[in-house]
Amino acid sequence: MNNNTTAPTYTLRGLQLIGWRDMQHALDYLFADGQLKQGTLVAINAEKMLTIEENAEVRELINAAEFKYADGISVVRSVRKKYPQAQVSRVAGADLWEELMARAGKEGTTVFLVGGKPEVLAQTEAKLRNQWNVNIVGSQDGYFKPEQRQALFERIHASGAQIVTVAMGSPKQEIFMRDCRLVHPDALYMGVGGTYDVFTGHVKRAPKIWQTLGLEWLYRLLSQPSRIKRQLRLLRYLRWHYTGNL
């Protein structure tokens, strides 16, 4: 019988990743023995792997995060190639966030939401409360000035939030989480990018079959042809993968 409260780690190009077998493993690991873990969750995909290589500050930020997990299918395939016995699966950040929110609602875990447009954030709060009875103890949209950051950190700390989710895009959200933890360290932080937009229906996600086949990237490209430059950039990652430079 597998022990879901622990997880192996795997290294790709110097980055240590948690190897979750599936979503249930991820949830049981984060809520091991009824105690929510504290630290920072960062989703890792091929694009982020490239950014880490190119930007020393981002690499330092992400290396410092306790819980780095495979969000992209390319990363999962690379782990399996380097470690043939690895039982690791993709855990999509958007799905993990929803499951965390559902679990938080069930267990009364307090949540603070940061980021997104004001109207999207308001809709996210309403849906979380209606759908899972999530105890949201505070929120702040993404439109705040740099000089307001410290006051926001103090608000988060005063709220006593056990989970803080930040939708600001990378690396802004990683910088925010790092700095906020100096004021409010006793929480689980999660960078969620555009998840609020998807959750509220403002952005359409790839159909399940595309996700299952590992083709969510292609769906996004077909939906947004302007992403072609970003996708071509990923050829470098494919070279790492197929030459075994992992």
Curated annotation (Swiss-Prot):
Sequence similarity: Belongs to the glycosyltransferase 26 family.
Pathway(s) annotated for this protein in UniProt: Bacterial outer membrane biogenesis; enterobacterial common antigen biosynthesis
Keywords in alphabetical order: Glycosyltransferase, Transferase
Catalytic reactions of this protein: UDP-N-acetyl-alpha-D-mannosaminouronate + N-acetyl-alpha-D-glucosaminyl-di-trans,octa-cis-undecaprenyl diphosphate = beta-D-ManNAcA-(1->4)-alpha-D-GlcNAc-di-trans,octa-cis-undecaprenyl diphosphate + UDP + H(+)
EC number in record: 2.4.1.180
Highest taxon of source: Bacteria
Transferase keyword on record: yes
A biological-process GO annotation: enterobacterial common antigen biosynthetic process
GO molecular function list: lipopolysaccharide N-acetylmannosaminouronosyltransferase activity
InterPro entries, per database record: UDP-ManNAcA_Trfase_WecG (IPR023085), WecG_TagA_CpsF (IPR004629)
Enzyme's top EC category: transferase
Organismal lineage: Bacteria, Pseudomonadati, Pseudomonadota, Gammaproteobacteria, Enterobacterales
Cited function: Catalyzes the synthesis of Und-PP-GlcNAc-ManNAcA (Lipid II), the second lipid-linked intermediate involved in enterobacterial common antigen (ECA) synthesis.
Descriptive protein name: UDP-N-acetyl-D-mannosaminuronic acid transferase
Pfam families per UniProt: Glyco_tran_WecG
